[in-house]
Amino acid sequence: MTTETLTQLEQHELFLRRHIGPGADQQQEMLNFVGAESLEDLTAQIVPGAILLNRDLAVGDSCGEAEGLAYIRKIADKNKVFKSYIGMGYHGTEVPSVIQRNVLENPGWYTAYTPYQPEIAQGRLEAILNFQQVSMDLTGLDLASSSLLDEATAAAEAMALSKRVSKAKKANIFFVADDVFPQTIDVIKTRAECFGFEVVVGPAEEAVNYELFGALFQYTNRVGQICDHTELFAKLHEKKALVSVAADIMSLVVLKSPGSMGADVVLGNSQRFGVPMGFGGPHAAFFVTRDEYKRSLPGRIIGVSQDTRGNRALRMAMQTREQHIRREKANSNICTAQVLLANMASFYAVFHGPQGLKVIAERIHRLTDIVAAALTAKGVELVNNTWFDTLSIKGLDVTAVQARALATGLNLRIDSDGVIGVSLSETTTRSDVAELFDVLLGEGHGQDAAALDAAIIANGSSSIPSELVRKDAILTHPTFNRYQSETEMMRYIKRLENKDLALNHSMISLGSCTMKLNAATEMAPITWPEFGNMHPFCPQDQAQGYAQLLEELSTWLVDITGYDAVSLQPNSGAQGEYAGLLAIKQYHESRGDAHRNICLIPQSAHGTNPASAQLAGMKIVVTACDKAGNIDMADLKAKAAEVADNLSCIMVTYPSTHGVYEETIGEICEVIHQHGGQVYLDGANMNAQVGLTSPGFIGADVSHLNLHKTFAIPHGGGGPGMGPIGVKKHLAPFLSGHSVVKHGLESDNNGAVSAAPFGSAGILPITWMYIKLLGKKGLRQSTQVALLNANYVMKKLSAHYPVLYTGRNDRVAHECIIDLRPLKEASGVTEMDIAKRLNDYGFHAPTMSFPVAGTLMIEPTESESKVELDRFIEAMVSIRGEIAKVEAGEWPVDNNPLHNAPHTLADIMDPAFDSRPYSREEAVFPTNAVKANKFWPTVNRIDDVYGDRNLMCSCAPVSDYE
């Protein structure tokens, strides 16, 4: 029998061994190879001593998975899941089990990355294309994005687009109807202030009284009224203004489309298409506009192109609009969006089909009609005389009604003027309606739902005017009409999944992206109703579980970052950057330094940095990097001194985007502070800091954290993400506030950057679990193994490829850059060829041509075992051998396995393959490891130029299905 203690047998650190890829023996092998005695020795060799923490993190010890689940179950049980009739953009919905089990809970969908490598992402690209088709069909417009972060930020993007394309060039007013959701108005005002736009909020009909570049209307509006604004929109067009409409996606199934009324932009939340409320998110916003505005559209667009065999293939289209290319000139700073949730919404539409959606929408409307009939029968006055799912009621005893509602376990919308709102949803049942009668009318009301239903059938309903009833067909494409059985739906989802490479197949070593394990135990709580079915505007005493989770998580993040306060509102890394820069901007303004508007940004920075600075109303001054990849201190000092009077901040990433710990980071902070500026430290590379150092300890003032990188939230194929920010004490009063939910903080009345007060709160249990399970020791060791894995890969590959940058002791941080430019010059083989060839080896390519063109940036993360690292290294070494054959003239530059990659089954079945100078086995089974676990790309290399010149962003023609 064992002599181990009971504590040892309880295995409180078992999850640490599950999360970290290489076991102790593998770690020691790698340490021996790189020339370090231990993880501590390696850490001392890599991290500058001046910034190395000399304390443990105050996040507690690690715990077992069952123990962690028990902890968070107790927290979840503190949430009271009331039936919600609050509405305001968030509704109850039924998540089809076939979608929950096969998409939301499936690592084949949630661990994939943004489809920059489209040849190995055709499945989710098709699902996103379906989302775009749903968006276009329902809104009546031509071109949709693949998702935005939420309805409110989408509305802010609509404002920005309107300004870009409006021909009313001298106009500076954006009009917002006063019946738009308050959280949307809040976010618009925040964004407008940075742009210098004037926002006018007033009755919809007053929009024509202003010289404006754009206007926003809600359809149906906040009180539930369905307004036909066709004539108003025409008048606004005469003034050269653009018209945007925030629309309810479910209502559009049965209502006249905003596009047919003349809207130029239609946006909204797709949440009620099968995505839980999640206390505010994550949800995918849809954004649709006219084809003529395609180059001004924010966010990703999925388009149809063709591959080298002429077959239809999907890709991200018109990327030259985006931040990673256009930087401060980009349409938006949007990067990660909400692809996983967009996929869920698109599958919801596919599963139900147009007829199923119509039945759901009509049932919601019928139940609303029944409630309205009961109220009017008792002489109760309604604010609105048309409706889809929302009634606004006046004249009732608010106190009595609210007391009955809470006692019954349901939430109503209570307006400040005494109006009571009731918004019904897909989850509302006949018995719920009877319960509503009792709550709204009290005892003895005598109303019967069945009798009222019969009367409505006999007499008809006028709550949707005939001219506003949708008469055109929607979702006629075969995709939306053939998968209504669960068997077919399950197989369709599986067919798409099989086309994609995700973490459940192999390592995704994308530099600056941190594709680590998203453990099943961490993911489990997000599907619990206690987290998923909470409305973000519910009474705070019902959300005590969320309150505890958010408080504990904030406390942990404060300790990990070395800051004094945290805001959890930003729902992406880009939004976190924006929120952090806003805090800096408002801090300067509070000191009478509003003129401080210059942001210094190193030339190596990620494109979101300048895009976010521009969004915050700042001017960008670029600082140089030296030959070693570090910030050029002489240039930095000169430029900081030159702009000292107007210096707002610097945005710097640490470790640098070149993959090294810069020794001068402390001096950089000092220089900026000496000239009155603030230091924004981008948290993209936080996976190399946790437990070893921290932004606050280094000397920074504010950072955002990518919870979808460092803290285990999955990338979801392009979202969801979370970008909370940490700040020093002096910036805390300038964190984001919220117009609907107050928490008694100094920052409550500040503008919002997201629709919900805690952004995508529904996925925060993942990060809570990650920190709880790993504890202080596990978090630190995870960082150390990330460094070990990166240095192991770097040293192994350095014998075959030049490594571009190293830091002290010729070490890298958590990622390394290999320089392909000399090979390209010698052989003609490009970085694109190598990236696509890796697909044949079963790998997603590392980050290509960032931060330096002609390079690959590799970040293996701590979750990858030595076995997987060696398989990747073997692939890269094998590819180097293939390049050598091209260099030697054995293979032509334009006809070799790299140039023709990736290879498909169609390639090797083609008799014409015999004319190639390499064998079929060399093409698709280049190593024995590939034979054991082959991933087959389903298309050949895609023609990007063709796709942009022949832009098509909707489902394939029906003829393709015949």
Swiss-Prot record:
Positions of modified residues (N6-(pyridoxal phosphate)lysine): 709
UniProt catalytic activity: N(6)-[(R)-lipoyl]-L-lysyl-[glycine-cleavage complex H protein] + glycine + H(+) = N(6)-[(R)-S(8)-aminomethyldihydrolipoyl]-L-lysyl-[glycine-cleavage complex H protein] + CO2
Residues in coiled coil: none
UniProt signal peptide: none
One annotated GO molecular function: glycine binding
GO cellular component, one term: glycine cleavage complex
Pfam families, alphabetized: GcvP2_C (PF21478), GDC-P (PF02347)
Any one of the GO BP annotations: glycine decarboxylation via glycine cleavage system
EC numbers for this chain: 1.4.4.2
Entry keywords, A to Z: Oxidoreductase, Pyridoxal phosphate
InterPro entries registered for this protein in UniProt: GcvP (IPR003437), GDC-P_C (IPR049316), GDC-P_N (IPR049315), GDC_P (IPR020581), PyrdxlP-dep_Trfase (IPR015424), PyrdxlP-dep_Trfase_major (IPR015421), PyrdxlP-dep_Trfase_small (IPR015422)
Record's keyword annotation contains Oxidoreductase: yes
Cofactor(s) this protein cannot do without: pyridoxal 5'-phosphate
Stored Gene3D superfamilies: Aspartate Aminotransferase, domain 1, Type I PLP-dependent aspartate aminotransferase-like (Major domain)
HAMAP family attached to this UniProt entry: GcvP
Subunit structure: The glycine cleavage system is composed of four proteins: P, T, L and H.
Function: The glycine cleavage system catalyzes the degradation of glycine. The P protein binds the alpha-amino group of glycine through its pyridoxal phosphate cofactor; CO(2) is released and the remaining methylamine moiety is then transferred to the lipoamide cofactor of the H protein.
Family of this protein: Belongs to the GcvP family.
Name of the featured protein: Glycine dehydrogenase (decarboxylating)
Organism: Shewanella pealeana (strain ATCC 700345 / ANG-SQ1)
